[in-house]
Design a protein with these regions (language model features):
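N-terminal catalytic cores of peptidoglycan-degrading enzymes
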Residues: 1-104
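Short loop/turn segments at strand-loop or loop-helix junctions that form parts
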Residues: 34, 114-116
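Basic/polar, cationic surfaces and motifs that engage anionic cell-wall
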Residues: 1-8, 23, 104-111, 118-173
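Conserved beta-strand segments that form the floor/walls of ligand-binding pockets within enzyme
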Residues: 75, 112-114
Length: 173
């Protein structure tokens, strides 16, 4: 995967309005999981959420998202499709209240990757294959060593990507 002008060249681009300027160097990648409604994948609800276009009346679980403005740099769908919402040189709003190695507000120094799924369900082969390519490219381009789960930087609030996320598949050749 090739990065040019803060974007993956081959990723689908849907530019979210939910970002801020980046003031710190990138040295962390945070992996998340998301599906709206939880466990339902055949829709564009996540894309709509990141674009502030989610129809909150579609599902009762969406009501708590009414005033939420969030985004991620990348979103990896079940079939492996990669969508980029925020350029890497900007802060996506993915981590919320967070801390890593004593530093707060991980959005400022991390890249956020949402993986379509839920914490108690296995991820797909296509997701692992493309996620490995993404991580390999980002680690080289930005010289990043640390890749963590959202649950690691926000342990009181978050559980994603969950216990069924197979980290060993990211190390396979």
């Amino acid at each position: 995967m090739r990065i040019s002008d803060s974007f993956f060249v081959d990723a689908k681009k849907i530019l979210s309005p939910n970002f801020s300027e980046r003031e710190k160097n990138i040295d962390l990648i945070v992996l998340h999981s998301i599906s709206l409604p939880e466990g339902e994948y055949d829709n564009d609800n996540v894309e709509d959420l990141f674009m502030n276009k989610l129809n909150f009346d579609l599902h009762s679980s969406f009501q708590g998202l009414r005033n939420v403005k969030v985004s991620a740099h990348l979103y990896v769908k079940r079939d492996g499709t990669i969508i980029q919402f925020v350029p890497f040189n900007k802060c996506a709003w993915h981590a919320g209240e967070s801390i890593f190695k004593g530093r707060k507000n991980c959005n400022e120094f991390s890249i956020g990757i949402e993986i379509q799924g839920k914490v108690d369900e296995e991820y797909t082969r296509e997701q692992y294959e493309n996620l490995k390519k993404i991580l390999d490219a980002l680690k080289i381009f930005f010289q990043i060593d640390d890749v963590v789960a959202h649950s690691e930087i926000s342990p009181e609030r978050k559980k994603d990507p969950g216990p069924l996320f197979d980290w060993s598949k990211l190390d396979e050749n």
